[in-house]
């Protein structure tokens, strides 16, 4: 009997989350209410609180899987041993378009991300942003230090500068996803504009770091 009750509870939670997703996408986070979500799920407003404390908890659970994808990318950056790479491999990291891999990974979650960025959903995004940028900054700092150590670059960047660069990249990605034209996926026009902006940033880095190592083929 207990197993049946637990299974029923699981099914109800899944129904509520699906209804919450529908309401969030339809009305936006601010206009969504527990009452609207309950009505969509076909349960009473009081019953919904047996499963969730509020809409922020629901949104957090909806975004959890998507957040895990992003965190898996940044987690893979932790502890990368750049010293094990050849000079050619090390330089190629600079032109590897990691940001495009990130966007491709998130393509199926674009509606949810668009809704998140268009509406104030509490502190969830702020917490995620902090962790994401912190990890990206550490990854980049280790990378630039290795370039300098080998003499491939002639200048070191400060941690604060690297933090600001990581923040800028994160902000550009967020601005792109938040654009109404990208609600159902990144458009080719927006993708081209973003790639061009990242190319400008890359060329600036090349000049500032005075990178003097030639790679074969296209750099970006």
Indicate residue ranges for each PLM-predicted region.
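Hydrophobic alpha-helical connector segments
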Residues: 61, 76-108
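Short, cationic-aromatic polyanion-contact patches
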Residues: 4-10, 40-41, 119, 165-179
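Helix-turn-helix
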Residues: 4, 15, 19, 23-57, ...
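Amphipathic alpha-helical packing segments from all-alpha helical-bundle domains
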Residues: 101-108, 123-149, 160-167
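Hydrophobic/aromatic-rich alpha-helical bundle segments in the mid-to-C-terminal region
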Residues: 114, 147-201, 209-220
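Short helix-capping/turn signature of helix-turn-helix
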Residues: 52, 104, 118-122
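Short linear capping/connector segments at secondary-structure termini
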Residues: 83-88, 116-123, 152-154
């Amino acid at each position: 009997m207990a197993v049946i009750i637990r299974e029923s509870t699981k099914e109800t939670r899944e129904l509520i989350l699906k209804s919450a997703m529908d309401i969030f996408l339809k009305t936006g986070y601010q206009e969504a209410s527990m009452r609207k979500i309950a009505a969509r799920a076909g349960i009473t407003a009081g019953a919904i609180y047996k499963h969730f404390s509020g809409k922020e908890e629901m949104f957090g659970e909806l975004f959890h899987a998507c957040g895990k994808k992003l965190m898996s990318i940044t987690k893979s950056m932790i502890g990368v041993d750049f010293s094990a790479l050849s000079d050619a491999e090390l330089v190629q990291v600079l032109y590897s378009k990691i940001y495009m891999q990130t966007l491709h990974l998130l393509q199926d979650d674009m509606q949810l991300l668009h809704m998140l960025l268009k509406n104030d959903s509490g502190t969830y995004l702020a917490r995620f942003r902090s962790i994401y940028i912190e990890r990206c900054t550490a990854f980049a700092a280790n990378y630039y230090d290795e370039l300098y150590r080998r003499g491939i670059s002639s200048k070191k960047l400060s941690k604060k500068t690297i933090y600001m660069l990581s923040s800028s990249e994160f902000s550009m990605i967020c601005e792109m996803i938040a654009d109404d034209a990208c609600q159902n996926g990144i458009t080719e026009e927006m993708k081209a504009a973003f790639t061009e902006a990242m190319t400008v940033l890359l060329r600036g880095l090349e000049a500032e770091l005075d990178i003097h190592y030639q790679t074969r083929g296209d750099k970006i």
